[in-house]
Amino acid sequence: MLGVCYYPEHWPKARWKEDARRMREAGLSYVRVGEFAWALLEPEPGRLEWGWLDEALATLAAEGLKVVLGTPTATPPKWLVDRYPEVLPVDREGRRRRFGGRRHYCFSSPAYREEARRIVTLLAERYGGLEAVAGFQTDNEYGCHGTVRCYCPRCQEAFRGWLKARYGTIEALNEAWGTAFWSQRYRNFTEVELPHLTVAEPNPSHLLDYYRFASDQVRAFNRLQVEILRAHAPGKFITHNFMGFFTDLDAFALAQDLDFASWDSYPLGFTDLMPLPPEEKLRYARTGHPDVAAFHHDLYRGVGRGRFWVMEQQPGPVNWAPHNPSPTPGMVRLWTWEALAHGAEVVSYFRWRQAPFAQEQMHAGLHRPDSAPDQGFFEAKQVAEELAALALPPVAQAPVALVFDYEAAWVYEVQPQGAEWSYLGLIYLFYSALRRLGLDVDVVPPGASLRGYALTVVPSLPIVRGEALKAFQEAEGIVLFGPRSGSKTETFQIPRELPPGPLQALLPLKVVRVESLPPGLLEVAEGPMGRFSLGLWREWVESPLRPWLAFADGGGALYREGRYLYLAAWPSPELLGVLLAGLAQEAGLRPVFLPEGLRLRRRGPWVFAFNYGPEAVEAPAPEGARFLLGGKRVGPYDLAVWEEA
């Protein structure tokens, strides 16, 4: 199903009825409203003006449209900030942020939590039983603009309480953090400050705990809203719209309190921000990289325990990236179908009409500011017509699992040990290699069951807890670990037994030394799979195992024990392609090296082929396949769907 984000408060009431009618005629089913409307709902403290929202919801309902109602806590009004100036967050440099943008609040602020509780309760009491309201979105894009981590006095106080609950005694904290180093011992929890503005780098254990705390504070704030909505809006779904390439917040943890996950898909903006080779960035500037949206669909399907929406789908040029090209004609349709192929229940476009004013006036919508339909509108309407003729089959478990860990991203942010080391970069390298082989992927958190997966890839998991080790031991397929896995304890120390720590229960090896290398400094590793030039990261390993790949000095780059493999270097795309293809074949899968720009995704017995390239390509469909959309020759920026026997 399809939807759209709509802001009735931005437009004269005389337009609302016509807008709703055109939404229905375009084949849209859901409309998100209200997530930035607090100042219009409550223009002065205690003076509520519900009338305009009542009328807007009634207008949408009259056309049979279902509403996703956003709680308005992402934008506290000016009067609230003036009354409680302490709700404003403090940045890493110790500066109090100001009113005038959005997300201008601290998650730890008692005053703001109380105000949020009040407005969400009023909203839920008024609309929780309304038939037109299908569900709620909590807040909007938690953490956007660098707002997960605040450094205000309230956060410092809350952090001390969090530490006391975690460690119990200050002696335990000192031991866990290794505060004997640099004379950093603490006598009590009130001496512990937030880890910023230090002369040299702060203690990494301290910093990691602060990142954990900050993520927990967001979850607590979200749970406060969820509990209110559950009480006053029984039977209505609750979701939140997460962001792309964002790791400050543990979405797996927060989503435990939601019915499903949502995310905001902007393929062109993300591609422009990605550290891709220049030629690749130019090639996909108007289409988005072929794996950027797909990765997040698979991630948030995992976050949502099998269920997700795209709450905001890019319909045209955006306004927030360094460069904001217009999508190639056909791409809005392709992105929409791709989301559906990966299991999205709803794809909702942002926004119905481009705003002619304020910060996002250069962000395209389905309509231009003069209300004329724009390119994205016609493509969305085409998808709606195509969807009406098809009944999508359910999504099955993929044959490949990729283990993704937000805590791993924090570990490497705290201590990258190399300027180019990027957790997301490594994750994307593995994911893209799998996709280039035509393989479907489930993205799962550490500790999730790996039963039923023919192949599991763990690009890097520095902290291996007991539940994760148990899942690896019980995995039914091949498991590939990437560099730095098992390299830290839960308290951010090197394991006594050396890395890969607990994974030594699976692989008899020890990492005794590591190095990070500047770009261009490469070493050749070779073995039965071929010769590969590797750089950026290398580990020296002691092991009775004979390496599958070895460097010229005899050091190993890849080791195997039974169905477990350990990669002791940053892999090149060439190495990953050969290695993963071989492992997939061994696991009984059928990898296929796809043409550049072509990607596949299966949904039940249906196979989707998406062509991100400027030239037509042949879909790897068997002879006599029944095509539901398109044909065996997939045109530029087009797709095809066929049914497997």
Curated annotation (Swiss-Prot):
Reaction(s) this enzyme catalyzes, per UniProt: Hydrolysis of terminal non-reducing beta-D-galactose residues in beta-D-galactosides
Binding site for Zn(2+): C106, C150, C152, C155
CDD domains: A4_beta-galactosidase_middle_domain (cd03143)
Annotated EC: 3.2.1.23
Top EC class for this record: hydrolase
A Pfam family annotated for this UniProt entry: Glyco_hydro_42
Temperature dependency: Optimum temperature is 90 degrees Celsius. Retains 90% of activity even at 95 degrees Celsius. Retains 80% of activity during a 12-hour period of incubation at 70 degrees Celsius. Half-lives at 80 and 90 degrees Celsius are 23 and 4.7 hours, respectively.
Record keywords: Glycosidase, Hydrolase, Metal-binding, Zinc
Any one biological process term the GO annotation gives: galactose metabolic process
Molecular function in Gene Ontology: beta-galactosidase activity; metal ion binding
Function: Hydrolyzes chromogen 5-bromo-4-chloro-3-indolyl-beta-D-galactopyranoside (X-Gal) and p-nitrophenyl-beta-D-galactoside (pNPGal).
PANTHER family the record matches: BETA-GALACTOSIDASE GANA (PTHR36447), BETA-GALACTOSIDASE YESZ (PTHR36447:SF2)
Name the record gives this protein: Beta-galactosidase BgaA
Organism this protein belongs to: Thermus sp
Gene that specifies this protein: bgaA
